[in-house]
């Protein structure tokens, strides 16, 4: 089941910054639905708030930072998955270089 965060809750977290939320929607970074926002959209909105309102970064910079952030998070998940697989395989045999012959 998908969890949503109500519009009013997101606005509270953004200190009532409706303009910022509207801009994020225009840019396709969040989508306003009747049910509310997805948790990852709320996180994106909070990061955007910090970047724009507190650090003065322009919207083009925000888009780049958010894209790079999401790529970094995806890479982190992939590395964690690979580490899990390696752990399942167990330690390599002595003398095994780990390379196929």
What positions do the PLM features span?
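The alpha-helix within a helix-turn-helix
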Residues: 11
